[in-house]
A protein has these predicted regions:
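Class I SAM-dependent transferase core
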Residues: 1-101, 108-119, 183-204, 210
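Conserved nucleotide-cofactor-binding alpha/beta core module
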Residues: 77-187
Length: 210
């Protein structure tokens, strides 16, 4: 495919997937219209970069559907200079978008996770659920996928009043959620059922019902 083909596909993604589905933040729209998503998927899957589903990467991981990324960015309300803790950076697509929005990004990815293809973010390799405490406190926790629960270890790395955007998975259903941390306590609200990739390493502890 030519660069013109990808530009046309990117424009179609914005018009048919984002604008029609409540992604109405013009800064987010502009960033997603500019950053070449095809550069963040394997070469053999570049033609799939703009489909409305997750794109397989490596080691069982996948790139979130465009709509999931757009909604996370919108609900994150990224401001210039925000310190963002990005969990599950994959190949760096969301890191590139967050950087385009003016954020200072610390991107966490597993040791055996995908190779980040964007050099704008500070990359930390290790357990996703451990975060990057050395860069704390953060203004925004951006979990780029769905988890069973947000670990306390991540909440503890956030500034008071910090924003949190994530997907939560329950009984096989993934939901977009957002919230804030006030006095060390995270409050999350469910916004919509939304297809998102499920990140490894975030299993909730088993709870017994009597």
């Amino acid at each position: 495919m030519t660069e013109q083909n990808f530009s046309s596909m990117r424009a179609a993604m914005v018009e048919s997937q984002l604008r029609t589905s409540d992604v109405d933040d013009q800064r987010v729209i502009a960033a997603m219209a500019k950053v070449p998503r095809e550069d963040f998927v394997p070469a053999e899957r570049r033609a799939m970069a703009y489909i409305d589903r997750a794109v397989p990467l490596s080691n069982g991981r996948a790139l979130n559907p465009p709509l999931a990324t757009g909604r996370l960015l919108k609900e994150g309300r990224v401001e210039e200079g925000d310190r963002v803790l990005l969990i599950g950076a994959a190949t760096g697509y969301s890191a590139a978008l967050l950087t385009a929005l003016g954020a200072k990004v610390t991107a966490v990815e597993a040791e055996d996770g995908p190779q980040l293809l964007d050099g704008a973010a500070k990359v930390v390799r290790g357990a996703l659920a451990a975060g990057a405490p050395e860069g704390a406190p953060y203004d925004l926790l951006f979990i780029d996928g769905a988890v069973e629960e947000v670990p306390a270890a991540l909440v503890q790395q956030l500034a008071d009043g910090a924003r949190v955007v994530t997907g939560l998975v329950e009984r096989g259903v993934t939901r977009l959620c957002s919230g804030r941390v006030i006095s060390g306590v995270l409050g999350l609200a469910s916004l919509a059922d939304l297809e998102m990739v499920v990140l490894p390493g975030f299993s909730a502890p088993e709870r017994f019902v009597f």
